[in-house]
C-alpha cells in the first residue's frame, strides 16, 4: 500500500494528506511509513483513505490476474483465459485485467438471503442481479457469459430452498436475452462427500440420474438450438444500439 501511495502522490506526503483531508481528527502523517491498512475496528474511518485502499487492492488483483493469464498463454498459446468474477461491484478490480480474452461472472440466485420480487421471489431470486451483471460486463470486451450458474439447491446459504420449477431455465434465458454468449454451471455431478456434498449438480450422486436443474438445462439447450436455426448468422445489432450512451 505504501509503495502504491508513494507512486500515486509522487513521493509527496503533503499531497496525500491534503487529498485525504487528514487535518480533521488530527490524522496528518509525517511520512508514508506511518500509513497502515484501514482498521475496521476503529469507530469511524477516513473515506478517502478507504477509497485509495480499494484502488490499491483492485490494482494488485488486476496485476495478479494479468500475470497468471500471461503465464498460461506462455505455455498454452492457443488457450483462451478468463476468470470467474464474483460481481460485488464495490470491488474495483472487476473487468480491469486486459490480458483476459473475455469476461465471465458467477451467479447464484436462490440461497436464503435473496428476497427476490413477489410471492415467489424467494425461490426465483431478484432478476435485477442478472440484468445488471449483463449490462455491467457486456461493454468491457463485448464477449461475456456466466461461468458459474446455480444448478439447483445449494448448501452454503443461511437457508437453502429449492429453486422454483422453471427458475433455472428463466435465469439462462435472462443471460442470453441480455447479450450473454455462454453459460456454464458449477458442477456436473453432485459428490458423495466433502463440504458441498449437498450442493446440487446437473446429475445426482450416481452420476447418471439427471437432477431437476439438469432437466432445465436440457430443456434450455433444446430451445436455444431451435432459436439458433431461426436467426441468420449475418445479422448484426442495429446502429442505434451501438450509439447508446449511459
Stretches found by the model and what they are:
Residues 29-38, 66, 74, 78, ...:
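Carbohydrate-binding surfaces of carbohydrate-active enzymes
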Residues 1-132:
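Polysaccharide-binding and catalytic clefts of secreted carbohydrate-active enzymes
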Amino acid at each position: 500500500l505504501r509503495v502504491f501511495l508513494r507512486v500515486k502522490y509522487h513521493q509527496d506526503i503533503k499531497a496525500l494528506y491534503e487529498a485525504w483531508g487528514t487535518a480533521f481528527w488530527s490524522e496528518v502523517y509525517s511520512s508514508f511509513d506511518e500509513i497502515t491498512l484501514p482498521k475496521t475496528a476503529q469507530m469511524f474511518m477516513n473515506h478517502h483513505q478507504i477509497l485509495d485502499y480499494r484502488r490499491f487492492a483492485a490494482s494488485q488483483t488486476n496485476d495478479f490476474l494479468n500475470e497468471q493469464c500471461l503465464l498460461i498463454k506462455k505455455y498454452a498459446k492457443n488457450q483462451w483465459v478468463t476468470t470467474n468474477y464474483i460481481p460485488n461491484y464495490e470491488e474495483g478490480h472487476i473487468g480491469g485485467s486486459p490480458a483476459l480474452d473475455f469476461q465471465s461472472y458467477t451467479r447464484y440466485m436462490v440461497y436464503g438471503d435473496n428476497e427476490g420480487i413477489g410471492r415467489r421471489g424467494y425461490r426465483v431470486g431478484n432478476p435485477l442481479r442478472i440484468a445488471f451483471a449483463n449490462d455491467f460486463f457486456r461493454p468491457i470486451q463485448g464477449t461475456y457469459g456466466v461461468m458459474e450458474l446455480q444448478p439447483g439447491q445449494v448448501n452454503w446459504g443461511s437457508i437453502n430452498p429449492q429453486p422454483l420449477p422453471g427458475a433455472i431455465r428463466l435465469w439462462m434465458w435472462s443471460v442470453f436475452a441480455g447479450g450473454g454468449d455462454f453459460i456454464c454451471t458449477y458442477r456436473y455431478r453432485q459428490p458423495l462427500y466433502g463440504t458441498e456434498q449437498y450442493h446440487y449438480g446437473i446429475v445426482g450422486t450416481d452420476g447418471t440420474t439427471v437432477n431437476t436443474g439438469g432437466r432445465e438445462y436440457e430443456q434450455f439447450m433444446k430451445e436455444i438450438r431451435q432459436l439458433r436455426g431461426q436467426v441468420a448468422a449475418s445479422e448484426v445489432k442495429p446502429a442505434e444500439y451501438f450509439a447508446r450512451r449511459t
